[in-house]
From Swiss-Prot:
SUPFAM superfamilies: Arginase/deacetylase. Mn(2+) 1 binds at residues 109, 113, 198. GO terms for molecular function: arginase activity; hydrolase activity, acting on carbon-nitrogen (but not peptide) bonds, in linear amidines; manganese ion binding. GO terms for biological process: antibiotic biosynthetic process; arginine catabolic process to ornithine. Its EC number is 3.5.3.25. Disruption phenotype: Cells lacking this gene do not produce cycloserine (DCS). It catalyses: N(omega)-hydroxy-L-arginine + H2O = hydroxyurea + L-ornithine. It comes from Streptomyces lavendulae. Transmembrane segments: none annotated. Keywords: Antibiotic biosynthesis, Hydrolase, Manganese, Metal-binding. This is N(omega)-hydroxy-L-arginine amidinohydrolase. GO terms for cellular component: cytosol. The gene is dcsB. Its cofactor is Mn(2+). Involved in the biosynthesis of the antibiotic D-cycloserine (DCS), a cyclic structural analog of D-alanine, used as an antitubercular agent. Catalyzes the hydrolysis of N(omega)-hydroxy-L-arginine (NHA) to yield hydroxyurea (HU) and L-ornithine.
Length: 273
């Protein structure tokens, strides 16, 4: 079975249609798998604000997501979160680290998200998510993820200072061209697996996403990862950052691509009693 948690509160959104993107994805999953999502947070307008403003604004949503994720992760179902932004993972990754201390987090993202308040050039909260979960700075929402538990997959747009932090911390990186199913299996070994995906990991044009960069992964590579991870070892999945097109047909096409990528794992989870 699948527990579906959907973030609908603003969490550092800088683009207008991220919350709608999460809602569209969730509705499609509900229809495909007969689910009833747990919707968290109240939508608010996007803003180009600094992390120091966005983080306290998002507190209520992050706390609610953490509580919902904790309840699900302690159970037997596959935990699935559909998030408007990667910043929501500030609430979830510490829970994963606490409840599954031997888990490997596959952080599938075009960026490293390993900046800190001291290194960020943009002030964007979403660029500091993995570093916060690893305790390099205090988000107020917990930490506990050991850097060696994290594997950056498909990451290629990494700031110079951020790259040094990644190197010193010991976070593993699998570039897009090397992100095969076998490479991922070699990285996770026999550990439980948590998958975080920001759709900007894909080659631009595959899925409408914010902060896209060239030379990305292809949808077939993402699907291959879901096919390769044994169902009994997959403990949770986060899907983030669909910047939903205003045109309904294009939005539906994007969601269809997403559902095809995750189908191997979600079909297996839905079939479990």
């Amino acid at each position: 079975m699948i527990d579906l948690i959907v973030s609908q509160g603003r969490v550092a959104d800088r683009a207008a249609w991220m919350i709608e993107g999460a809602a569209r994805t969730a509705r499609a999953l509900e229809e495909r798998y007969g689910l009833k999502g747990h919707y968290v947070g109240e939508p608010a307008p996007h803003a180009d604000d600094d992390w120091s403003v966005a983080l306290p604004q998002a507190r209520e949503t992050l706390v609610a997501v953490r509580e919902a994720a904790t309840e699900s992760i302690k159970g037997d179902n596959l935990t699935v979160l559909v998030n408007n932004t990667c910043s929501v993972s500030l609430a979830t990754l510490p829970v994963v680290a606490r409840e599954h201390p031997d888990a490997v987090v596959l952080y599938i993202d075009g960026h490293g998200d390993f900046n800190t308040p001291e290194t960020t050039d943009t002030g964007y909260l979403g660029g500091m998510v993995l570093s916060g979960a690893c305790g390099l700075w205090d988000s107020g929402h917990g930490a506990g993820l050991r850097p060696e538990q994290a594997v950056l997959v498909g990451s290629r747009d990494i700031d110079e200072g951020e790259r040094e932090l990644i190197r010193k911390a010991g976070v593993r990186v699998i570039p897009p061209g090397e992100a095969t199913a076998q490479a991922v299996l070699d990285a996770v070994k026999d550990a439980p697996v948590w998958i975080h995906i920001d759709w900007d990991v894909l080659e631009p044009g595959s899925i409408p996403a914010d902060y896209t960069v060239p030379d990305g992964m292809l949808p077939a590579q993402i699907r291959a990862v879901f096919e390769a991870i044994p169902a009994e070892r997959l403990i949770g999945v986060e899907l983030a950052e669909l910047n939903a097109p205003a045109d309904s047909e294009r939005a539906e096409q994007a969601v269809a691509v997403i559902l095809d990528m995750v189908a191997p794992a979600f079909d297996a989870a839905a079939a479990r009693p």
